[in-house]
């Protein structure tokens, strides 16, 4: 690890189509091997599918999905005197959003279906409706934190 100062957090520019920073972050999470335009096309197609299926503007649906999938607490391993404890810690807003987007993309990739756009659209709709794998993962993380509440005094 570098001993220099921490790198400053870069500002995420809003995407050109929706003017949303969240959409740009999701494009970056989707991107593989630097193919940003392909990732953008997949996401825009997915958002169009969301518009068709829900009959609503896709941006609020996406924001709702990310809000629902964002964890409030998580566990971090902390070593104390030879034993490793899973210590529950609160999740900062940026990390929570990042985790939610990561889970949406990861579970979209593992879904059965033909195109990535359709799979991502389904995961976004499910997350907006409080169902789906991303929501299940958030619940799992919350359960782990709840189960290890006794070690909260080892907080970082």
UniProtKB/Swiss-Prot annotation:
Q: Extract the CDD domains matched here.
A: uS7_Bacteria
**A Pfam family for this UniProt protein?**
Ribosomal_S7
Q: Per UniProt, what is one GO molecular function of this protein? A: tRNA binding
| InterPro entries for the chain | Ribosomal_uS7, Ribosomal_uS7_bac/org-type, Ribosomal_uS7_dom, Ribosomal_uS7_dom_sf
GO CC terms on record? small ribosomal subunit
UniProt record, GO biological process: translation
List the keywords (alphabetical). Answer: Ribonucleoprotein, Ribosomal protein, RNA-binding, rRNA-binding, tRNA-binding
Q: Summarize subunit and interaction data from the UniProt record for this chain.
A: Part of the 30S ribosomal subunit. Contacts proteins S9 and S11.
Q: What does this protein do?
A: One of the primary rRNA binding proteins, it binds directly to 16S rRNA where it nucleates assembly of the head domain of the 30S subunit. Is located at the subunit interface close to the decoding center, probably blocks exit of the E-site tRNA.
Regarding protein family, the annotation reads: Belongs to the universal ribosomal protein uS7 family.
- State what protein this is by name: Small ribosomal subunit protein uS7
Organism name = Synechococcus sp. (strain JA-3-3Ab) (Cyanobacteria bacterium Yellowstone A-Prime)
Taxonomy of the source species:
Bacteria, Bacillati, Cyanobacteriota, Cyanophyceae, Synechococcales
């Amino acid at each position: 690890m570098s001993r220099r100062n921490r790198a400053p957090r870069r500002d995420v520019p809003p995407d050109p189509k929706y003017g949303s920073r969240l959409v740009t972050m999701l494009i970056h999470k989707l991107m593989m091997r630097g193919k940003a335009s392909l990732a953008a096309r997949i996401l825009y197609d997915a958002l169009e599918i969301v518009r068709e299926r829900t009959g609503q503007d896709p941006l609020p649906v996406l924001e709702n999905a990310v809000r629902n999938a964002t964890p409030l607490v998580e566990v971090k391993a902390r070593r104390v005197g030879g034993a490793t404890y899973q210590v529950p810690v609160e999740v900062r807003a940026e990390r929570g959003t990042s985790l939610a987007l990561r889970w949406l993309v990861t579970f979209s990739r593992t879904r059965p279906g033909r195109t990535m756009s359709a799979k991502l659209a389904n995961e976004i709709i499910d997350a907006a409706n409080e169902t789906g794998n991303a929501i299940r993962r958030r619940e799992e993380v919350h359960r782990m934190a709840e189960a290890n509440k006794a070690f909260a005094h080892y907080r970082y």
